[in-house]
Each structure stands twice: as structure tokens, then as C-alpha cells.
């Protein structure tokens, strides 16, 4: 029995296609999806179409992530999202999803349990079983804490974009990393496999190459690059460096704000300092320079 695990796609449909090919090559019996399917990259409906196709052809299990929660909250309650701002990328994502896409993500749970005959039960979630935005990272102690709280021997989660495994006594936590927006310095898609010939599961973390440059070109040709202020340019550069530039911009902007509200001006200054808005990356098809 072999399971394929995908998380944090972030609308990177080309990376997801590459991971699907790897899952098919390894003949995975069950495909598990841990949320954050959309936002950040262009054409979110293309990612949703891949999920629908996978659901038809394979035994798939899904939970929602925090990005799906953002989209659904905007859909149901409205928000002050605007283009040319820190929320422009989310607004682009929402406006490029269909009614069926919204219905699909709305129906997803935030946690589920996979029970396969003769094998240890597996709990799946995005961050933690009780909240999508709980951050489990290597060394921060949260994986052990959440493992202690769940009944199942295996817990699968994403959100941190950091692939790792952790054991607590007879329990196992696996984070497959990010399919679509890597942060560990290697610009290749990340996923995981779990394999078992008996009762217990053995994890394997995998990196899968994909056409990064094509994804960056899509961010530009779709108009997303110019609709989201700092965020989309940071993601575009992150896709070719594997470094968490979007988060770095936010953290630097918080310091510039000196305890006050972070404004778009702070974010743009942070992005310039980090080379996100000023660098021209011709060889990757990314040619964006802020002039304001």
C-alpha cells in the first residue's frame, strides 16, 4: 500500500501536474491533499480542474487550508480586498474561481481520518486538526504537542512549507512540504509518500522538478504580477530561488512600521531592500521593476 501526499499547491498547476506524474509513476493507491490549493500563482481554476480530474481517477482525500478559508470568508462576508494592495493576490484568486470551485472548497473539512484495513489510522489536516493556521515546524515543539493530542498513530499536515518528519514514542508526523511555493532554498516541488507492507507507515520525502519559468511567465501574462503590489513579485522570485521572500517582506515591513500598522508603503520599501521590486530576472521570464 502506497499513499501520495500533496500540500500547499498555491495555484501552481504546473508543479501539481509534475507531482501527479510522480504519484502515477510510483503507483500510489491513495492520494491525500492537505489544503492551500489556491492563491499566489496564476489561473487558480486550472489547479481546481486538476483536483477534479484526480478525484475521478484516484482514491482521493481532501481537507481545506487557510487560503481556502480566506477565499470563503470573502465570498460569504465580503472584505476590503483591493488590487494594487497587499490583498490584490487574494482578490485575483477569488475572481478567477468558479461557483463550482467555491462549492467544492466550502464542502471540505479541516480534518479527517483515513482508515485503511490492516493499517494504522491516519489523521490529516492543514496546520493542526483544530485550526488551519497552527504552524508546525522542525524544532518548534508543536509537532510533538499535536501528536500527543491526537488519537491516531500518524498525523499528516502542511502549512509550514517545510518538509520534515517527527516521531513521538509510537506516533509519526509527516509534513510533505509545498507542491507550489517552496521555502527551503531548493526550487523544486515537494511531496511525500507513505508506504506500508504491514501495519505501520514508512515516510519518504520527495522533490520533483517542474517548469518554474513557465509559472513565473503565467504570473506576468495573467496580470497578477501587477495587481498585488509586493506579494506577486515576491512569489515570482521565490519560485526560482526557493527562498521565502514573501514572508521576508512581511517581517521586514513589520520592523519598518515600528509597532504600528503595516502599510503598502512599508511593504514596498521592504521589497526594494530585499531586491524583490528592483531586480529584473530576464532569464526566468520575470521582468518587473517598481517605479513608484
What name fits each language-model region?
Residues 81-84, 119-150:
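Active-site-proximal segments of metal-dependent phosphoesterases and phosphodiesterases across multiple
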Residues 170-176, 180-292:
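Acidic, His/Gly-rich catalytic cores of divalent-metal-dependent hydrolytic chemistry
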Residues 2-102:
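Core catalytic region of metal-dependent phosphoesterases/phosphodiesterases
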Residues 143-153, 160-166, 171-176:
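Anionic-ligand binding region
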Residues 7-9, 35-38, 66-68, 127-128, ...:
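Active-site metal-binding loops of divalent metal-dependent hydrolases
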Residues 23-27, 57, 116-118, 149-151, ...:
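Glycine-rich phosphate-binding loop signature in dinucleotide/nucleotide-binding domains
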Residues 1-4, 113-123, 168-172, 200-202:
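Beta-strand-turn-beta hairpins that frame and shape the catalytic cleft
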Residues 111-114, 163-167, 190-194:
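Short beta-strand scaffold segments in enzyme catalytic cores
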Amino acid at each position: 500500500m502506497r499513499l501520495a501526499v500533496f500540500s500547499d499547491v498555491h495555484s501552481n498547476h504546473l508543479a501539481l501536474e509534475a507531482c501527479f506524474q510522480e504519484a502515477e509513476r510510483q503507483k500510489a493507491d491513495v492520494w491525500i491533499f492537505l489544503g492551500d490549493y489556491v492563491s499566489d500563482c496564476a489561473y487558480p481554476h486550472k489547479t481546481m480542474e486538476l483536483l477534479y480530474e484526480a478525484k475521478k481517477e484516484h482514491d482521493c482525500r481532501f481537507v481545506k487550508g487557510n487560503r481556502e478559508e480566506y477565499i470563503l470568508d470573502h465570498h460569504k462576508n465580503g472584505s476590503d480586498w483591493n488590487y494594487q494592495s497587499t490583498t490584490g493576490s487574494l482578490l485575483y484568486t477569488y475572481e478567477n474561481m468558479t461557483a463550482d470551485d467555491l462549492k467544492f472548497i466550502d464542502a471540505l473539512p479541516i480534518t479527517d481520518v483515513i482508515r485503511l484495513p490492516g493499517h494504522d489510522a491516519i489523521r490529516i489536516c492543514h496546520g493542526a486538526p483544530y485550526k488551519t493556521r497552527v504552524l508546525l515546524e522542525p524544532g518548534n515543539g508543536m509537532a510533538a504537542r499535536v501528536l500527543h493530542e491526537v488519537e491516531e498513530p500518524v498525523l499528516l499536515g502542511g502549512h509550514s512549507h517545510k518538509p520534515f518528519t517527527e516521531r513521538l514514542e509510537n506516533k509519526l508526523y509527516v509534513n510533505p512540504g509545498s507542491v507550489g511555493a517552496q521555502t527551503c532554498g531548493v526550487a523544486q516541488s515537494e511531496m511525500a509518500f507513505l508506504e506500508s507492507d504491514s501495519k505501520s507507515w514508512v515516510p519518504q520525502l520527495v522533490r520533483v522538478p517542474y517548469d518554474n519559468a513557465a509559472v513565473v511567465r503565467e504570473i506576468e501574462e495573467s496580470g497578477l504580477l501587477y495587481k498585488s503590489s509586493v506579494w506577486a513579485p515576491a512569489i515570482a522570485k521565490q519560485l526560482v530561488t526557493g527562498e521565502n521572500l514573501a514572508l521576508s517582506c512581511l517581517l521586514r515591513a513589520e520592523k519598518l512600521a515600528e509597532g504600528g500598522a503595516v502599510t503598502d508603503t512599508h511593504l514596498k520599501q521592504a521589497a526594494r531592500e530585499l531586491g524583490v521590486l528592483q531586480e529584473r530576472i530576464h532569464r526566468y521570464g520575470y521582468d518587473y521593476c517598481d517605479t513608484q
